[in-house]
Amino acid sequence: MRELRFYNTLTRKKENFIPIDATRVRLYVCGPTVYDYAHIGNARPVIVFDILFRLLRHVYGNEHVIYARNITDVDDKINARAAYEYPELALNDAIRQLTQLTYTQFQQDTMALGCLPPTIEPRATDHLEEMRSLIERLLEKGHAYKAENHVLFSVSSIRNDPHYGSFAKRSLDEMRAGARVDVASYKREEMDFVLWKPSAEGEPGWTSPAGIPVLGRPGWHIECSAMSMAKLLAPYGGGLTCDDPTENVFDIHGGGLDLIFPHHENEIAQSCSAFGTERMANLWMHNGFLQVEGKKMSKSLSNFITIRSILESDFFEFNGVLTNEMKQNWAGLSARFSMLQTHYREPLNWTAQRLMQSSSELYRWYELLRCEKTEMEKKNEVIDDSLINALSDDLNTPKALTLLRKFYKRGNAVSLASGMNFFGLLRQEWVRDGKCPLFMRKTSLDEKFIDQRIAERLRLIHNKEWTAADTIRDKLAAEGIVLKDIKDPQTGERTTMWEIKRF
């Protein structure tokens, strides 16, 4: 079995990845809160963990990897946005309208970014029973308490490892100083956090745990503990009915650096306290932060960019015959390519220039594949082992893309295509369709005239009249026509393909 090494946030070092059970490798990633269009910061973990998902499937087999990415559809941000967007509706109706709209948009965005769908996408509102049961387990074990119709996690109740703050590598004093925590009067200690809260009249609410007489809703942190339990533990012998702590650990938990504290710290506290485990997951992976043009992305700085705005932007020319879907898919793959050029743990600086450069380079790759499609059809597309080696070393996508560039420079279309396909950058129909509108920009030159000039150039080359041949090539280039000389696969004779220059 291939050796995989990843940086583990839990231990702050690279480690060999050894799955608990190689026939069911389990990955959980924190997904979106569906109250607004996803922004490009949200796109980064979606793309990063899609690459990890693809690698795990390659190594262990498609049917042996379970990837769960949750959807948070109950949250105070959702309530506030729903009331603002749909003031004419009752709040619960407004919430349903908002969450369905933003969830559907998120699905469309991730598809345009070239991502595979996760194995499972649990929604918080479908797992309220598991949340209540988990909260009641924490109450029974003395790790939670009730106060004014709330249930709170007691941080001081943790006596064994992992102690609270060990994941974030912070002491309680450091966390108190750096955290913006609610110091409500019903808390025993300021770092205690909400597992369940009462709902005001008109707010969404469900039957509360532990006999609390009013309707309520879960806190954010308990949602992920419950959903990961429901999808990655309970189906495989773990969960609340299992007394063996070793059965209540899964393989990989992922998310952004911003989630380390408090969200992931609190998830670990809840899950480990409920199940008596030393770890919630064996490997924790976090992608780095994203900036826009060297600055923190913020609505106040007017540099807040949604995935949707990228997909709908006109950062490069298209001719008028493209469908909206094709435009958006090209923009999505360009954005994906741009992000993969930075290692997932490094900060990523998103710039318009870099997006255009990525789009231009990706276009050239497609041009090679289109020119060599006959040759590609003769050979099986087997992923080059050097690409898998690069990804096996902590998802080193920059190194892997450097290898793809070498394939391009050598004209190795077969290896380039298989690599692009593995990275989610290849749409086969764009290569196979000789008249794909993406590669058919308008020109003022008549096609018959172009073909005549190409024939004349080939004659000059045959006669070794290089200067005259180059003159024809240069004049066509000035009109936006790019020539590519190839050998006819049947006769071995030189022939020339032409495309309208894309950039």
UniProtKB/Swiss-Prot annotation:
Its cofactor is Zn(2+). SUPFAM superfamilies: Anticodon-binding domain of a subclass of class I aminoacyl-tRNA synthetases (SSF47323), Nucleotidylyl transferase (SSF52374). The keyword Cytoplasm applies. It holds the Pfam family tRNA-synt_1e. It comes from the Bacteria. A motif ('KMSKS' region) lies at residues 296-300. This is Cysteine--tRNA ligase. It comes from Bartonella henselae (strain ATCC 49882 / DSM 28221 / CCUG 30454 / Houston 1) (Rochalimaea henselae). The gene is cysS.
